[in-house]
Amino acid sequence: MSSAAASEPLDHAPSPALSRATVDRTGERRTDDAWLAGAWRERGRLLLLDDDYRVLADDVPEKVTGAGIGGERLAGSGPSPALHLLATEGDERPDDAVFLGADDEAAYFARRVDVLPESDGARPALLREVGSALGDRDAGLLVHAVALLTWLDRSVHCPRCGAVTEIRSAGSLRVCPVDGSEHHPAPTRR
């Protein structure tokens, strides 16, 4: 094999199931309160996650195969699951609704709820149950929502002084009110 052939990308290599995303996270918009308010009011879509980080998804088979999940149906055969996104309500974004990003169709937000609402055709599902079968947009939104809300839930206190931090930048930043330190989501290191 020549060195040129070895360095060429493999066109047939699939993307890892949970690394797909089409929504622009638009980091520059996270601190733009006027833009966030307009996006919430005019074209917002809301993803709800319960205390177990389950979401409502439409067309979820009882069993899906892929990413190490056993089942009877192969991902990609039959209708693909889709996240159940709600239209945002009200003029103001609730403080606990985090901004996930935007595309040409909508601005996407997520928030935690104690109990997911009842919905015809949708059932609660975990990321690991549906992630590999979701389309690119929904897979990216769900991975981002679970990661960001998990970080927010587990990083309440300042690691420097122990004070309760304040959520800023539409959920992508925590700031300590005592020492002013900023804390960003970061991957867990083992």
Please state what every model-predicted region is.
Residues L85, F99, E105, F109, ...:
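Generic detector of bulky aromatic hydrophobic side chains
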Residues L86-T88, G135-D136, H144, G180-E182:
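Intrinsically disordered, low-complexity segments enriched in polar/charged residues with Gly/Pro
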Residues S2-G135:
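N-terminal alpha-helical interaction blocks
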Residues M1, L10-H12, L18, F109, ...:
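Aromatic-residue detector
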Residues P117-R160:
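A gly/proline- and charged-residue-enriched helix-loop-helix capping module
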Residues V143-R190:
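Cys/His-rich short segments
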